[in-house]
């Protein structure tokens, strides 16, 4: 894997760009879906805590 990363850096026409500028619209859509999934997981965990009877 490190060789692939070095190769990408070596052939990058503009190495000064950061990752956010390299993203394609599909990459941005994937990030949005991942963020949405993270929110759903977070909400589900909170709801599960509320439904769980408190142990005393």
UniProtKB/Swiss-Prot annotation:
Basic and acidic residues: compositionally biased ranges: 1-28
Region (Disordered): 1-33
Covalent link location (Isoglutamyl lysine isopeptide (Gln-Lys) (interchain with K-? in acceptor proteins)): 56
Residues where Deamidated glutamine is found: 56
Family annotation (InterPro entries): UBact
Record's comment on post-translational modification: May be modified by deamidation of its C-terminal glutamine to glutamate by the adjacently encoded deamidase. This could be a prerequisite to the subsequent conjugation, as shown in the other prokaryotic ubiquitin-like protein Pup.
Listed GO MF terms: protein tag activity
UniProt record similarity statement: Belongs to the ubiquitin-like protein UBact family.
Function of the molecule: May function as a protein modifier covalently attached to lysine residues of substrate proteins. This may serve to target the modified proteins for degradation by proteasomes.
Name this polypeptide is given: Prokaryotic ubiquitin-like protein UBact
Organism (species): Yanofskybacteria sp. (strain GW2011_GWA1_39_13)
């Amino acid at each position: 894997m490190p060789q692939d990363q070095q190769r990408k850096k070596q052939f990058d026409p503009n190495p000064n760009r950061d990752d956010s500028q390299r993203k394609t619209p599909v990459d941005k859509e994937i990030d949005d879906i991942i963020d949405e999934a993270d929110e759903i997981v977070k909400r589900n965990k909170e709801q599960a805590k509320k439904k769980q009877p408190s142990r005393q």
